[in-house]
Amino acid sequence: MSAASRRTLLGICLVVGGSFTVLASFNYVLTPMLTDLDLSQSQASLALSIPPIASLLVVFLAGGLGDRRGHRTVMLWMSVAFIVGSLIVSIAQGLLAVVIGLLIEGIAATAIQIIGIGLLSDRFSEPRARAAAFGTFGMVSPFVWLCLPVLTGWIVGEASWRWVPLMWATIGAVMLVATLALLPRPTSTRPVGEVATPILAGATVAAAVQWLNRVGDEGLLAPISLASLVATLALGAICTVLVRRLPSPAFSLAPLRVGRARSLLAVVVIIPLINTVFLMTMAFQYLYGLTVLQTALVMVPAQAAAVLGTRLIAAPMMRRIGVTQTASVLFAVLSVAMLSVFFVTPTSPLWVPILYVTIYNLLTVAASITVTSAVLTSAPDVNSGQLSAYRGSAQSLGAVLAVVVMNGAVFTLGRLFMSSELQANGLTQEEAAAEAAQIQASATSPDVMSQYAVPLPSGVETSQVMADSIATGLHVNGVLGALLALACVFLVRVGRRQSLSA
């Protein structure tokens, strides 16, 4: 790899890595921020759902802008926007300013990630250099998640929460300098062209995500769910009509016409669907009574393993056996590893779930970066910006499906198990249902288990039944995750066959 290539890779890692910082640290600043601004949890949940949805509006526009106006130029604009959004949050006196700041920052971060991955694919096309570049780039996200939660927890514990968005703004300044100093200037630029179709495509994805959210919260036939579905279909129809009628639309459905691209994008959707890290963080708090900061600390081995895994496992494997075989092997091993969740029980020592989530994170992140590399070469006639945008949209859909499908399945089966166990220990069906509903409504703090130490008629404590139901939920996630990992193996192999037969 030449000095210029190394400089470009460093710049991409710094700028894209900086864009992850808000997402990696925001949960740790949320509680003190709500207290300071005198906001309710419901207000915050409603308002803070807007920025990630709105960020999807620019996902396809960003891919096109990078290819037309130059990756460096657009990343420069977005770094400035990232700083502005962070500063607005730091001086916010109410919810509106927080939402506006996070909205600007979220749009900027989304655009930077889409454009940065597209630039990475364009600059590193030779297989060995590409494997090394993507292996290095794959270290960035887990490294940010390794450092930022602990750093944010320390800042919030020692000073005002407003220092955290000031930290984001400082990181944004580093991103700005890295863009100017390290990324190559565009050799040519083209007019932006029409922007209606990429914005409508992003709006369609955003509406679809909102529909899935509403289905999860309100139910499939709730009026707001049906309204979201109608909006999704209407936006999709308008976008399709414009794509067909405009002489040169900026948005294209070309990636979806390529079999290998479709298969790999399906894998991108499935990866976040497994959602084991989120469920394990809940288990650390409710099974082991850890605080949020303690949970961040016990997750350090998992993030450190992911950092090393992409560089020391994924990159060498991609060089030696190719992207497809690497992804297949990693997902196959992940499928087996997911079944080790049965070693995680209410009585298992803390190191058991730490080891489990560490192995999971290592394999998942290594497989993810391998699939990302494959997606960006899955449709040779489509530019990397569009493919990167499709990947970002697929990832967003997967994250929402994780809440609607995986969390729904885990929590539903966990509640059924808990209700059954409560009845088995002496409660009537009505009493068990009422107790389960009360527990669900109050389960908002790490010490919730101690609130239910009252023995049941059988003599077993309610907290023990709760612990067993949480462990059952983890086991459900492990089995479903193993099946989803096998589905990824199948889709990767199908995509390979479609590529060879094309």
Language model regions located:
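12-transmembrane solute porter fold
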Residues: 5-22, 26-34, 41-48, 85, ...
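Membrane-helix boundary and inter-helical linker elements of multi-pass secondary transporters
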Residues: 36-37, 42, 67-68, 90-93, ...
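Helix-loop-helix hairpins in multi-pass membrane proteins, especially solute transporters
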Residues: 52, 56-197
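Hydrophobic/small/kink-forming positions within alpha-helical transmembrane segments
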Residues: 53-57, 87, 142-147, 202, ...
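Transmembrane-helix signature of multi-pass solute transporters
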Residues: 81-88, 171-178, 234-238, 333-340, ...
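Structural signal for membrane-spanning alpha-helices in multi-pass inner-membrane proteins
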Residues: 89, 179, 213, 239-243, ...
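Hydrophobic transmembrane-helix bundles of small-molecule transporters
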Residues: 135, 153-267
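Hydrophobic transmembrane architecture of multi-pass small-molecule transporters
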Residues: 395-494, 502
